[in-house]
Amino acid sequence: MSSDKAKAFDAQFPTYKSEFQIPTFESLGIQNSKYSPETNSIYLCGNSLGLMPRNTTELINRELQAWSSRGVEAHFNHSHPQGTDWVDIDLPLLPLLAPLVGAKQNEVAVMGSLTSNLNALLIHFYKPKGKRTKILFEKQAFPSDYYAFLNIVQVFGYDASHLIQIEIPKGETYIKTETILDVFDKYEDEIAIVCLPGIQYYTGQFFDIAKITKHVKTSAPDVVVGWDLAHAVGNVPLSLHDWGVDFAAWCSYKYLNAGPGAIAGIFVNEKYTEQNKPENYKPRLAGWWGNNSSQRFQMLEKFDPIASALSYRQLNPSVLDCVALKSSLEIFNKVGGMLSLRDKSLAMTQFLQDILTKSNYYIEQGETDVNKFGFKIITPLDPNQRGCQLSLLFQPHRDEKKQNVMERVFEYLHQHAIICDERRPDVIRLAPLPLYNTFEETRIGATRLLEALEAIKDDYI
């Protein structure tokens, strides 16, 4: 693909790069005589850690100043005219976050971390009864999810046999929706919870959340449907309320650009938070920040949960984490949310795919020769079945790191400040983000990758 075509796309789709801090060759410690130290990197790694919004520093410094000048009194009397009293620091985030996940404001909360939130939701929603004791999820789930699922069945006295894992069929690179539905139908009478990723972290597959949720709830209304949206929130449009999802959890340090280890979020369908009706209340991991805010500081020995997802909060949230997340959510709000970004995302990832698939080093997904030199795209080639990420599987594999194709390509990219993500042993994930990446950057990144393969091909062919 020519630079002219990339620039034509860039003229069509706006970029919001100026809202973010972009690492340079110098700041990354990369020395390459072909580039000046102040040259910006091409950052295709927002699926691992999003870039820092420029406004984050100002917002965090505002809170540090409030702490410095007011101390504990900033909880109820912030020092800045635009500051939020710390007692309510997370509340301004809710109207910004809810549209990104397609929720009502009373269905979202900012709290904890992804795995701690998933554990809290499982404790609340996993209610094994009779034959319904099992959790259905994917075999290739992120390890932390597996640990959470295994732990919760063990808490109730069961073992790993109560975990049903859906595997990628032999010869395929991802799980088709029909496979998921077939496995559910096979074990329907034994399943208590279905919990899948909105987007699979390794392959980049965008699961059909609406279809899967509807199928499960139609076939077995008592089965709870939850989603790990770590790679979906801020990446693709979501409509959790309208889709009838029961619960979801996500992190904020990837596509939401809230910083490493950032505060996370949850969705709980409002039908579960009508606490004023005793028959609808279910015990959960409770804490004082989920209690009625008007009584919170009365120190009563009575838990009166807030009638919203906020009732799942256990403790007061980190002020610095909340304002870091707010700085990014305000950008999403400013540009019109995910629907306004999705068209660019679809076009940009397709642009990347078109460059790669026209290469002599591209290997079809169904190719079985593992010694053939090049790469496969293990992400669905259908744009509607993925987010912005493409996952490339390089071959042939070599146990020696210095001889492994993926490692050598990754090193070449890094020396040219093409920042992406490696998943050993053989995968590189490329994620052009519509907020701060351009088509020209995407073209250059793909070009450098193909250059790397050209440079080493004689060692394998």
From Swiss-Prot:
Gene3D superfamilies, per the entry: Aspartate Aminotransferase, domain 1, Type I PLP-dependent aspartate aminotransferase-like (Major domain)
Record keywords: Cytoplasm, Hydrolase, Pyridine nucleotide biosynthesis, Pyridoxal phosphate
The reaction(s) this protein catalyses: L-kynurenine + H2O = anthranilate + L-alanine + H(+); 3-hydroxy-L-kynurenine + H2O = 3-hydroxyanthranilate + L-alanine + H(+)
Main location: cytoplasm
Coiled coil location: none
Any single Pfam family the record assigns to this protein: Aminotran_5
Sequence positions that bind pyridoxal 5'-phosphate: L114, T115, F142, P143, S144, D145, D228, H231, Y253, W288, N316
Subcellular localization(s) per the UniProt record: Cytoplasm
Pathway participation: Amino-acid degradation; L-kynurenine degradation; L-alanine and anthranilate from L-kynurenine: step 1/1; Cofactor biosynthesis; NAD(+) biosynthesis; quinolinate from L-kynurenine: step 2/3
Domain of life: Eukaryota
Enzyme class, first EC level, given as a word: hydrolase
GO BP terms: 'de novo' NAD biosynthetic process from L-tryptophan; anthranilate metabolic process; L-kynurenine catabolic process; L-tryptophan catabolic process to kynurenine; quinolinate biosynthetic process
Keyword S-adenosyl-L-methionine carried by entry: no
Entry similarity comment: Belongs to the kynureninase family.
Subunit architecture: Homodimer.
Function: Catalyzes the cleavage of L-kynurenine (L-Kyn) and L-3-hydroxykynurenine (L-3OHKyn) into anthranilic acid (AA) and 3-hydroxyanthranilic acid (3-OHAA), respectively.
Name of the molecule in the record: Kynureninase
Gene designation per UniProt: BNA5
